[in-house]
């Protein structure tokens, strides 16, 4: 596998990608997330310390483009039974879980799996306070 060091090189290497996982210092994360949205990529933002204003701007812009921004501070998700970042591999099934706390969702899904049920998708959208403030701002 060839390594890339620049954003444009990565996008050229994977032209069919539909998701960007961003893990940089929070002060730089919004700029990179906006670049991903410019390229019509969904965003999973592992970075924390992103301002609420940046989070609202990113999520509003993503919604307008029909895209998804998970995070900031999103360290785990699973989409269509594919684990992303720090996610446990779970038996594939038909249950979907959406929430604000990645570790909370991870624990819930582990308990569901231990009970013999199967998970299809789990999405972590943001920290609880940010998610509530964002939801209130877009009403």
What are these regions (language model features)?
Residues 1-139:
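Catalytic-core regions of core metabolic enzymes
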